[in-house]
């Protein structure tokens, strides 16, 4: 059962409401998905930093104040936190299996970003949040560098297209009953992703299993 989107009305400069909210969302995702690995969630009230990061060594997920400013509801914040939880899980797997390290991540960072995006969609759905918020928050905060080669992350347009395809394939009910259809950031995604969505339509039409090369 999806939780109705709740607007963020917090003043994280005056009290601990931001910390309480981030912890609540984080532990809700952990518990709903039966994730046994230990991790903690912190807020750094720096409004100039629009980001969330995972510190592999300490399994700390840090949400910066700027991200709270850009997040319009709990769905969007949950999408980002779920993405970082995926990275934290991989850090645990590395300690236990000996294959994951910052060096490994630095060699194939885009692979881990795509993996974290898809797993985050699963996590938020299981926790009762709307996965389409992943598209709206990413469209707001993730820049589109001119050259992907020199970036540690895939192009935002490709990440958005891959997330949309994953939701379309695995959770189509969220597109049928789309509570974000009138959201200006979702509308902008529809505008800017037309070519990529046509590629997806062609794949579905031909019942193809090939991976789409998104733009």
Predicted regions and their residues:
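C-terminal capping/extension segments of zinc metalloprotease domains
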Residues: 1-24, 31-43, 68-69, 74, ...
């Amino acid at each position: 059962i999806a939780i109705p989107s709740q607007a963020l009305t917090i003043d994280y400069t005056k009290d601990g409401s931001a910390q309480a909210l981030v912890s609540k969302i984080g532990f809700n995702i952990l518990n709903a998905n039966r994730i046994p690995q230990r991790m903690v969630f912190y807020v750094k009230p720096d409004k100039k930093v629009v980001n969330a990061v995972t510190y592999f060594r300490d399994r700390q997920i840090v949400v910066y104040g700027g991200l709270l400013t850009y997040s319009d509801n709990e769905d969007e914040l949950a999408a980002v936190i779920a993405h970082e939880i995926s990275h934290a899980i991989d850090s645990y797997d590395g300690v236990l299996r000996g294959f994951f390290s910052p060096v490994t991540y630095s060699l194939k960072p885009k692979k881990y970003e795509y993996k974290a995006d898809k797993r985050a969609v699963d996590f938020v759905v299981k926790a009762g949040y709307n996965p389409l918020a992943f598209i709206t928050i990413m469209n707001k905060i993730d820049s589109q560098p001119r050259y992907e080669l020199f970036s540690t992350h895939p192009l935002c347009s490709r990440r958005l297209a891959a997330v949309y395809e994953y939701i379309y394939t695995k959770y189509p009910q969220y597109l049928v009953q789309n509570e974000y259809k009138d959201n200006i950031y979702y509308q902008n995604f529809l505008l800017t992703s037309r070519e990529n969505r046509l590629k997806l339509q062609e794949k579905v039409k031909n019942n193809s299993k090939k991976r789409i090369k998104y733009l």
